[in-house]
Amino acid sequence: MKTVLISTGGSGGHVIPALNIYDHLKTKHDVRLYTDIRGAKFIPKEVDKTIFEVKKIPEKKYFFLLKVLFLTFAFIKAIIHFSQNKFDIVVSTGGYMSLPIVLAAKLFKKKIFLFEPNSIIGRSNKFLLKFTNKIFCYDKNIIGIDKNYKDKIIELSPILQKCMYIKKNLNYTDNKKIKILVVGGSQASLFFSQNLKNEIIKLSSKINLELTQQLSSGYNINNYKKDYEKNNIKNNLFFFEENFLCKNSNFDIAITRSGASSLAELCHLNIPFIAVPFPSATDNHQLFNAKRYADLKCCWILEEKNFNSGDIYKKIIEIMNNKNEYIEKKNNLKKLSENISWENLNKKIISYLDEN
């Protein structure tokens, strides 16, 4: 049995895959989870974790020296942790706090694996690539990796929660009621909460629909619900839940942000989606994530910068009037997730970590 340190922090996009990797490894190895305060809120209370906080400094030139100082302190702290614990392997799923941990792991000559689910490599991972043994990716053609490091890429099917492999939304049924999911990922989407309600109400005058919508924190669900009920729209409104799609997967179409985990889950469940990438995502990675699926003819894209009132209404009406395109996208999603199982993925991950 080896001791594996999983380093993760920041958003759910980093932490949730780390938890899924934790589940894959915990039966064979002694697994320790390191995260920061922000990331800890996504981790169940019953999962043991170590808080490793790193002060994040704004990306401003005049803060550069202060940033270096804080990272140096964090690196020293990481060295102390490695000197007090016998870690064999480090797996980093990202987050600002992972930078000093991976550098300390290199100093102590540990095996290092990075995880990059996006279609363009993140800045920290790009910097750390020279120190790592391998990098797990969902896309072998990931953008931004130097050709000298291409041999470090290990392409894996998405690392999802185990419950996802039980549920599938395989068949198209020409129901009279269209079930729509609006989801914004772990950080929710203020844009969706502010802009989609009137679109949905207008849409309900043309098609019989049932709505399930994630709201941003701070919104009053009851007040929001009243407007839908006035228009006879059956609805289920909720705030972020980590395993929501494990319990609710029977949807005809989704409107979603384009975080890698959100798109991977919708793909695995065979739910065609309209992607509205978050325009402020670092290096515009959400747009690249969406384009990957669009190139595979699995989704539609609406960019927020070009968004006008009525766009969602028009797009869904267009989709409902062109069932052949919808069915094509659903079938393409099905092909992407065929023959994928928790057990096979588990064997692959463990075999790579156990290689000498």
Where do the language-model regions lie?
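Conserved donor-nucleotide binding/catalytic region of nucleotide-linked donor-dependent transferases
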Residues: 300, 306-337, 355
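Donor-nucleotide binding loops and adjacent catalytic segments primarily
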Residues: 34, 39-47, 165-169, 173-254, ...
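Acidic donor-binding loop of glycosyltransferase active sites
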Residues: 87-89, 249-264, 271-272
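An amphipathic, basic-hydrophobic alpha-helix
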Residues: 60-89, 103, 107
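Conserved nucleotide-sugar phosphate-binding/catalytic loop shared by glycosyltransferases and other
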Residues: 4-9, 31-70, 156, 184, ...
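Active-site-proximal region of nucleotide-activated glycan assembly enzymes
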Residues: 30, 38, 108-168, 295
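C-terminal alpha-helical cap of glycosyltransferases
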Residues: 338-356
